[in-house]
């Protein structure tokens, strides 16, 4: 059935990959040279799933669940997972000029606030049923946050210890909810590749190898992920639509949601077109040409990856669309303001694509959109006008009265040449240099001057005190990459918004370099390119703080009086 099913070596259909201990040992990988002690399983291992369209349910190797009605009094909050409402989208559909009926499956009505509650409960209960997860054990999971919340919720009810490993990009609201549920949280660098030991996947596996009786339920490979949607979510959709739908639109992260739903719809409603949504900067979409972009980072959380998760079956997706941050957040805000649906950013991604894809549908046809999570996790992000302005996703109202300096350019500031640090300098030496020069932070650049990240005194000292690095370690191990770049042509008003949230902003300019002369963002070596192609590199011009802005305003006001 759904992807992630292991195929035993004798050819018979096996169980879940993460629960098949013999299979897991076969798949364990040693790290590359220089990292020989690392033991882990890749989240993009080729799927050995035996699902085929038209195959009888009786031939499935899996345990399957059947939809049941909710009792009047729930035994615990875990029974409030599933049976989410289907809601008609009225204003957005009308404004987009759609002829078809547009419906939203509102997954933020699950107990933990997202579609990931379904797979979290299913993975735990399947592991318990198989005898692999026992009282007193520890659950570890690398996640963008929502799966972590679902697991922490179930762990709180069932009494398991829960450790969640998530990238720094993810919102503080998610961190606060996880802490409230009793989970332990480990943050990892957002820009770390998935196969890096520093990534959320790599750190989770290191913890598993260190903590006795711990388990990575592994949403990227676990068949319980798409099975939860094959057995439940898809059946709910079919029941709510009386078996009649012509298009389904869903975003993809691990791919479990779209895979599980699509497989069931291919069986029960073969005429339904499956539309996949993948953010620009991710590589999940097909054909591969769709993924070609210079963009590598995006703000929408919970969707897209730099690898193809095992559970994602791209063969059941009829067409992929790429989404972008600006449209995603605009449509998420529209869903809230016009439809009253308190959803998150990835819901906006799905809806932005839906209004494009559904234009081909006619009157009497129906399109269903999956809205994955709630706005609760993003109160300080896209729900905030300041955040949207700072990120460039909103334009300021020209009619709003602003200070005299608001629309002046950053180039008006008298910025001195910045202190920069090479990635090979030690933490100990960097701290000494910063203290000697009286700086709190400095850009870290490679040999060609391209920005790799920032290093701050606070970040280095906290990492040293926590034992994450040693004084003799290179400063590249404590890079801070969530800095806010700003250009000389940006306004001081834009700078002001950034400084309301951060202690500094990095003033950058772009320089075109020949790739056979440039150094890569990977510290320590030149780019392996000989085709003479050119690329844009961000070069540091200066570092600006709130004090710099205040001094400029005060000095100008003195000269004007």
From Swiss-Prot:
- Binding-site list for heme: 49, 62
Write the record's keywords in alphabetical order, separated by commas.
Answer: Amino-acid biosynthesis, CBS domain, Cysteine biosynthesis, Cytoplasm, Heme, Iron, Isopeptide bond, Lyase, Metal-binding, Nucleus, Phosphoprotein, Pyridoxal phosphate, Ubl conjugation
Q: Where does pyridoxal 5'-phosphate bind?
A: 146, 253-257, 346
Q: How is its activity regulated?
A: Allosterically activated by S-adenosyl-methionine/AdoMet. Activated by S-adenosylhomocysteine/AdoHcy. Binds non-covalently to a heme group that may control the redox sensitivity of the enzyme.
**Pfam families hit by this protein:** CBS (PF00571), PALP (PF00291)
Tell me which SMART domains the record gives.
Answer: CBS
Q: Which reaction does it catalyse?
A: L-homocysteine + L-serine = L,L-cystathionine + H2O
Q: Which residues carry this modification: N6-(pyridoxal phosphate)lysine?
A: 116
Q: Give Gene Ontology CC terms.
A: cytoplasm; nucleus
CBS domain mapped to chain residues: 414-474
Which residues constitute the cross-link Glycyl lysine isopeptide (Lys-Gly) (interchain with G-Cter in SUMO)?
A: 208
Q: What would be an example GO MF term here?
A: oxygen binding
What is one GO biological process annotated to this record?
A: L-serine catabolic process
Q: Which residues carry this modification: Phosphoserine?
A: 196
UniProt pathway annotation? Amino-acid biosynthesis; L-cysteine biosynthesis; L-cysteine from L-homocysteine and L-serine: step 1/2
> Where found, per UniProt?
Cytoplasm; Nucleus
**Swiss-Prot/TrEMBL cofactor(s):** pyridoxal 5'-phosphate
**Protein family according to the UniProt entry:** Belongs to the cysteine synthase/cystathionine beta-synthase family.
Q: Per its database record, what is this protein's job?
A: Hydro-lyase catalyzing the first step of the transsulfuration pathway, where the hydroxyl group of L-serine is displaced by L-homocysteine in a beta-replacement reaction to form L-cystathionine, the precursor of L-cysteine. This catabolic route allows the elimination of L-methionine and the toxic metabolite L-homocysteine. Also involved in the production of hydrogen sulfide, a gasotransmitter with signaling and cytoprotective effects on neurons.
User: Under what name is this protein listed?
Assistant: Cystathionine beta-synthase
Give the species. Mus musculus (Mouse)
């Amino acid at each position: 059935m759904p992807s992630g099913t292991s195929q035993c070596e004798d050819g018979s259909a096996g169980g879940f990959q993460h629960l098949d201990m013999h299979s897991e040992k076969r798949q364990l990988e040693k790290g590359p040279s220089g990292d020989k002690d690392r033991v882990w399983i890749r989240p993009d291992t080729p799927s050995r799933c035996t699902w085929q369209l038209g195959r009888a349910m009786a031939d499935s190797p899996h345990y399957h669940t059947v939809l049941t009605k909710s009792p009047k009094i729930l035994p615990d909050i875990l029974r409030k997972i599933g049976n989410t409402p289907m809601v008609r989208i009225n204003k957005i559909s009308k404004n987009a000029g759609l002829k078809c009926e547009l419906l939203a499956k509102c997954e933020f009505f699950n107990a933990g606030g997202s579609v990931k509650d379904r797979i979290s409960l299913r993975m735990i209960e399947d592991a318990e049923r198989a005898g692999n997860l026992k009282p007193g054990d520890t659950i570890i999971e690398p996640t963008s946050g929502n799966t972590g919340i679902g697991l922490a919720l179930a762990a709180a009810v069932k009494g398991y210890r829960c450790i969640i490993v998530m990238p720094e990009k993810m919102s503080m609201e998610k961190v606060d909810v996880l802490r409230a549920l009793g989970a332990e949280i480990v943050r990892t660098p957002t820009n770390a590749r998935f196969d890096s030991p520093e990534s959320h996947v790599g750190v989770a596996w290191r913890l598993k190898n260190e903590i006795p009786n711990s388990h990575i339920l592994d949403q990227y490979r676990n068949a319980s992920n798409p099975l939860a949607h094959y057995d439940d979510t898809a059946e709910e959709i079919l029941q709510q639509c009386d078996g009649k739908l012509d298009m389904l639109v869903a975003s993809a992260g691990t791919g479990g949601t779209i895979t599980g739903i699509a497989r069931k719809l291919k069986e029960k409603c073969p005429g339904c077109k499956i539309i996949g949504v993948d953010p620009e900067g991710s590589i999940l979409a097909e054909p591969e040409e769709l993924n070609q972009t210079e963009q590598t980072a995006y703000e929408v959380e919970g969707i897209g990856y730099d690898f193809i998760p095992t559970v994602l079956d791209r063969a059941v997706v009829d067409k992929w669309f790429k989404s972008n941050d600006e449209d995603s957040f605009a449509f998420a805000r529209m869903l809230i303001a016009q439809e009253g649906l308190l959803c998150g950013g990835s819901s906006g991604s799905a809806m932005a694509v839906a209004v494009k894809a559904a234009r081909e549908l006619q009157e009497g046809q129906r399109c269903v959109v999956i809205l994955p999570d709630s706005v609760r996790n993003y109160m300080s992000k896209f729900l905030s006008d300041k955040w949207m302005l700072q990120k460039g996703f909103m334009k300021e109202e020209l009619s709003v009265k602003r200070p005299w300096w608001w629309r002046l350019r950053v180039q008006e500031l008298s910025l001195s040449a910045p202190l920069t640090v090479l990635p090979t300098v030690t933490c100990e030496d960097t701290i000494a240099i910063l203290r000697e020069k009286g700086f709190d932070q400095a850009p870290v650049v490679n040999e060609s001057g391209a920005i790799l990240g920032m290093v701050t005194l606070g970040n280095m000292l906290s990492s040293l005190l926590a034992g994450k690095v040693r004084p003799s370690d290179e400063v590249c191990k404590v890079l801070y990459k969530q800095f806010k770049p700003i250009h000389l042509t940006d306004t001081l008003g834009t700078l002001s918004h950034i400084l309301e949230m951060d202690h500094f902003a990095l003033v950058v300019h772009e320089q075109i370099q020949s790739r056979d002369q440039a150094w890569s963002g990977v510290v320590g070596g030149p780019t392996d390119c000989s085709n003479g192609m050119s690329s844009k590199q961000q070069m540091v011009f200066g570092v600006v703080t709130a004090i710099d802005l205040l001094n400029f305003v005060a000095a100008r006001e003195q000269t004007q009086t």
